[in-house]
């Protein structure tokens, strides 16, 4: 009679490696997102034109919370003009071609900031700094997340 047997050695080590994979993945993704928002903030601050420095100082980030949400924002109560710098104030919004944000997504977002009092901000050209910084870093974020090893 011919017979053979098979077995797996190191199964306990393999189980241990997979047991904490979910936690390690969450940590890896959170770290990648946190580093990305810091990079986006730095890029946006470097890209924005400085007159008084108020807009540049208003560019801030918040790292991930328990829901995995992080953001970079520009503007505050005293710098309400940030979206007008980003998107301009002309009727025909002229946004740059981006890789990770479609033109329709850009336009939809930009339309939220249509100038309510055109006398105050008229015909300001588009001078993007935040969306272009996001676009630059988003692909790097995805690549970093994909690098995760179990």
What are these regions (language model features)?
Residues 1-150:
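Short, Lys/Arg-rich flexible segments
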């Amino acid at each position: 009679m011919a017979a053979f047997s098979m077995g797996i050695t190191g199964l306990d080590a393999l189980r241990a490696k997979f047991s904490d994979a979910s936690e390690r993945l969450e940590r890896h993704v959170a770290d990648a997102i946190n580093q990305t928002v810091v990079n986006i903030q730095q890029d946006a601050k470097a890209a924005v034109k400085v007159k008084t420095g108020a807009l540049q100082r208003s560019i801030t980030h918040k790292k991930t919370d328990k829901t995995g949400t992080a953001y970079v924002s520009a503007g505050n109560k005293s710098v309400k003009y940030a979206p007008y710098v980003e998107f301009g104030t002309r009727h025909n919004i002229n946004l740059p071609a981006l890789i990770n944000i479609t033109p329709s997504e850009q336009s939809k977002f930009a339309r939220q900031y249509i100038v309510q009092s055109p006398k105050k901000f008229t015909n300001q050209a588009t001078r993007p700094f935040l969306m272009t910084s996001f676009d630059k870093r988003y692909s790097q974020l995805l690549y970093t997340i994909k690098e995760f090893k179990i």
